[in-house]
Amino acid sequence: MPEALYFTDSDEANRLIAQEPLALLISFAIDQQVTVQQAFTGPLKLRERVGTLDAPAIAEMDPATLETAFRTPPAIHRFPRAMAQRVQALCQVVVDEYGGKAERIWTEATDAADLRKRIGALPGFGKMKITGFGSVLALHFGVEAAQELVPEYPCLGKINSAEDLAEYQAAKRAHKASLRAQASA
């Protein structure tokens, strides 16, 4: 397990997402239509506001309380209701399928296909997030089953510093522009 991941400007958030499996999972779940930095500081803000990052506690939390935590300025996400609902649903899956332990999603996966299926069944995880999350698991946590999920294009798993993050974001913008150009051709 790495000491930190360099996905935010906050040392505390970077340590949290590296050391707390549910924090990493929540970060990926809300990494949509906000910056990487905002998504990956989300779990730290959530823990500060609700007092825990315990999957059973979040799954059982009053939805209005969780939404308030997401909405309170500065908001955790630009779509606080939707992301609060997504995180609560994610935590419920972690409770129901993995005994409340997020890391069981990857530590108990039998191979890449099983890991892809497990990640893909999580609320808010499509193809891009499966490969992004898989790349982090493979390249930072040494998860063997995730090795096949590492894409050739720039991804979060290949970030090892603040400089890498800036390069990743520039490459990601270029990659998306290329995909849009191909689609319109």
Positions of the model-derived regions?
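C-terminal accessory module of base-excision DNA glycosylases/AP lyases that mediates lesion recognition
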Residues: 1-15, 19, 112-121, 127-185
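Structural motif
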Residues: 12-23, 33-35, 77-82
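Short, aromatic/basic-rich helix-turn unit that serves as a nucleic-acid recognition element
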Residues: 25-29
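Short alpha-helix boundary/capping elements
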Residues: 33-38, 51, 95, 141-142
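Short Gly/aromatic-enriched secondary-structure transition segments
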Residues: 40-46
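Alpha-helical ds-nucleic-acid-binding substructure associated with the helix-hairpin-helix region
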Residues: 46-121
